Curated annotation (Swiss-Prot):
It comes from Salmonella schwarzengrund (strain CVM19633). It comes from the Bacteria. It is found in: Cytoplasm. Keywords: Cytoplasm, Decarboxylase, Lyase, Porphyrin biosynthesis. The record marks D77 as: Transition state stabilizer. GO terms for molecular function: uroporphyrinogen decarboxylase activity. PANTHER family: METHYLTETRAHYDROFOLATE:HOMOCYSTEINE METHYLTRANSFERASE RELATED (PTHR21091), UROPORPHYRINOGEN DECARBOXYLASE (PTHR21091:SF169). It catalyses: uroporphyrinogen III + 4 H(+) = coproporphyrinogen III + 4 CO2. This is Uroporphyrinogen decarboxylase.
Length: 354
C-alpha cells in the first residue's frame, strides 16, 4: 500500500506525539458544499450516490480539496446494514429514512440474514478501495458503522424517531427479541467493519447516535455491551499498522468511564461534555475526539477561532486529541466558516505540542 504522508490523525488516536492537533469534521462530505449538491444531483438520489464507487469517492475527496483536513471518511450511510438485510430502505422528502418492512417481533428478527460484506455490501468495499487508491496516501481513510442499538432504533421504529416509544416498548415488553436483534447486528457490524479494514480503511468509528436516549442501566445492557462485543471482534492491525477504533455515543458524556473499558482507542465527545473534565476522567486510557458545537460554524470566523482556542486550552498540553465537531456539520453552514475552523485548529494548536 502507498506510504501515508500525513498520519497525524492515526498518531493522535494512539496518543502518540504530533506537531499540531489533527482535525476533521463529521459529515465533512455533505450538503453544505455546492460541489456535493452537484454530484448528488448527478447520482439521482442519496443511495445511488452511496452505491456508485466513483461518485462516493468523488464526494469523499471534495472537502479535502477545499480544506487541509487530516482524515477522509468514507461516504456512506449508517443504514447500509439494515438495507442489506432486506428491510426496504427508502428516503421520504423532509422525513428522512424509512423502512417498508420494520422489525416488530422475534419472528421478524429470526428471518433477518447477516449480510455478506463483499456481496450485498460489496458496493461499500468497492468505494473503500476506490477512495484509498485516489487518496494516494495523502491522509488516512476512516471507515464506520452505526452501533447495533442505533441501527435497531431505525429498524424497529421504521425510520427516524423523536420519542423512541416503539423500540422502548420492545425493550421493556420483549427484551429477548431485542437482544436477539442486537446480537445479530453486532455480528453484522463486526463483519462489515473488518471487511472495510481489509479493503483499506485505516481507522474505524462506531456511531451510537441514539445511545443517549437510554437510562444508564439500559445503555450498559442494550448499547454498550454490543459495542464492546464488536470492539473485541475487530481486526486491530492491518498492513503492518494498528487500526484505531473510536466509539461515539451522542449524549453519552456521563458514561465515558464505562466506554473507555471496552478496549477502544478513542471516544468521540458531543458538545455537551466538557473536554477538560473528559480528559481528567478517561484521558489516561483513551484519546478524545471533539467537540465544538456544530452550530458555532454559523458564527463569524473570529468567534469560531475563540471557541477553537477555548477547546484546545480545555484539553491542554500533550497528545490524544483529535479536533472535530460534537456532531455532524449542518447543511447550511457557509463553506468558508468550515475553512476558518480547520485553519484555526492547526494554527492555534502547535503551542500544545512541543
Amino acid at each position: 500500500m502507498t506510504e501515508l504522508k500525513n498520519d497525524r490523525y492515526l498518531r493522535a488516536l494512539l496518543r502518540q506525539p504530533v506537531d499540531v492537533t489533527p482535525v476533521w469534521m463529521m459529515r465533512q462530505a455533505g450538503r453544505y458544499l455546492p460541489e456535493y449538491k452537484a454530484t448528488r444531483a448527478q447520482a439521482g438520489d442519496f443511495m445511488s450516490l452511496c452505491k456508485n464507487a466513483e461518485l462516493a469517492c468523488e464526494v469523499t475527496l471534495q472537502p479535502l480539496r477545499r480544506y487541509p483536513l487530516d482524515a477522509a471518511i468514507l461516504f456512506s450511510d449508517i443504514l447500509t446494514i439494515p438495507d442489506a438485510m432486506g428491510l426496504g430502505l427508502y428516503f421520504e422528502a423532509g422525513e428522512g429514512p424509512r423502512f417498508t418492512a420494520p422489525v416488530t417481533c422475534k419472528a421478524d428478527v429470526d428471518k433477518l440474514p447477516i449480510p455478506a460484506p463483499e456481496d450485498e455490501l460489496g458496493y461499500v468495499m468497492n468505494a473503500v478501495r476506490t477512495i484509498r487508491r485516489e487518496l494516494k496516501g495523502e491522509v488516512p481513510l476512516i471507515g464506520f458503522s452505526g452501533s447495533p442499538w442505533t441501527l435497531a432504533t431505525y429498524m424497529v421504529e421504521g425510520g427516524s424517531s423523536k420519542a423512541f416509544t416503539v423500540i422502548k416498548k420492545m425493550m421493556y415488553a420483549d427484551p429477548q427479541a431485542l437482544h436477539l436483534l442486537l446480537d445479530k447486528l453486532a455480528k453484522s457490524v463486526t463483519l462489515y467493519l473488518n471487511a472495510q479494514i481489509k479493503a483499506g480503511a485505516q481507522s474505524v468509528m462506531i456511531f451510537d447516535t441514539w445511545g443517549g436516549v437510554l437510562t444508564g442501566r439500559d445503555y450498559q445492557q442494550f448499547s454498550l455491551y454490543y459495542m464492546h462485543k464488536i470492539v473485541d471482534g475487530l481486526l486491530r492491525e492491518n498492513d503492518g499498522r494498528r487500526v484505531p477504533v473510536t466509539l461515539f455515543t451522542k449524549g453519552g458524556g456521563q458514561w465515558l468511564e464505562a466506554m473507555a473499558e471496552t478496549g477502544c482507542d478513542a471516544l468521540g465527545l458531543d458538545w455537551t461534555t466538557d473536554i477538560a473534565d473528559a480528559r481528567r476522567r478517561v484521558g489516561h486510557k483513551v484519546a478524545l475526539q471533539g467537540n465544538m458545537d456544530p452550530s458555532m460554524l454559523y458564527a463569524p470566523p473570529a468567534r469560531i477561532e475563540d471557541e477553537v482556542a477555548t477547546i484546545l486550552a480545555g484539553f491542554g498540553q500533550g497528545e490524544g486529541h483529535v479536533f472535530n465537531l460534537g456532531h455532524g456539520i449542518h447543511q447550511d453552514v457557509p463553506p468558508e466558516h468550515a475553512g476558518a475552523f480547520v485553519e484555526a485548529v492547526h494554527r492555534l494548536s502547535a503551542q500544545y505540542h512541543n
